[in-house]
Amino acid sequence: MPIGVPKVPFRLPGEEDAVWIDVYNRLYRERLLFLGQHVDDEIANQLIGIMMYLNGEDESKDMYLYINSPGGAVLAGISVYDTMQFVVPDVHTICMGLAASMGSFILTGGEITKRIALPHARIMIHQPASSYYDGQAGECIMEAEEVLKLRDCITKVYVQRTGKPLWVISEDMERDVFMSAKEAQIYGIVDFVAIETTSNSLTN
């Protein structure tokens, strides 16, 4: 079984011989980005860097962010979301497999009318969690206050991006709410559910 990231040939403009680069590097050149892991600072910084580079390279071409993520760090996810709103090109979001927690938050941050879920994708929303480490009582109180601020921020974004009333989002975030692709479309997290006859539209 092959180990590591697969490599593909790529020929630079003006060069006769192709060089081998990893498949993700090749796809980034086509403005196709991937979030296929737990959301942490490292992957967030990578995605932010790529989006900023592509934004500077050509502001007229859309970007496509494919998501299969169980979620992760709240601030890392928010930083990706904010960058998606900052760059000039529209960012399409496509859910493959699972977009849970911060994964669904990033999914809903795609350009409205350009958020897609594949037919068997699953989407989950819930409130941000805290580590509640063993520390001073005052530190725990400060952390709890910060979690409440983050929850308020995330709730307001879901309200804005889905069109759902504040009370609905607040109530649903009290627990893990899983949705099918169609349910996520009805909820407003995505705009379309992809079907085989329109699969080519994901990159066109």
Swiss-Prot record:
It comes from Anthoceros angustus. One of its GO terms (molecular function) is ATP-dependent peptidase activity. This is ATP-dependent Clp protease proteolytic subunit. It is found in: Plastid, Chloroplast stroma. Signal peptide: none annotated. It comes from the Eukaryota. Cleaves peptides in various proteins in a process that requires ATP hydrolysis. Has a chymotrypsin-like activity. Plays a major role in the degradation of misfolded proteins. Pfam families: CLP_protease (PF00574). The keyword Nucleotide-binding does not apply. One of its GO terms (cellular component) is endopeptidase Clp complex. Belongs to the peptidase S14 family. It is an enzyme of class 3 (hydrolase). The gene is clpP. It catalyses: Hydrolysis of proteins to small peptides in the presence of ATP and magnesium. alpha-casein is the usual test substrate. In the absence of ATP, only oligopeptides shorter than five residues are hydrolyzed (such as succinyl-Leu-Tyr-|-NHMec, and Leu-Tyr-Leu-|-Tyr-Trp, in which cleavage of the -Tyr-|-Leu- and -Tyr-|-Trp bonds also occurs). Its EC number is 3.4.21.92. Gene3D superfamilies: 2-enoyl-CoA Hydratase, Chain A, domain 1 (3.90.226.10). The keyword Cell wall biogenesis/degradation does not apply. GO terms for biological process: protein quality control for misfolded or incompletely synthesized proteins. HAMAP family: ClpP.
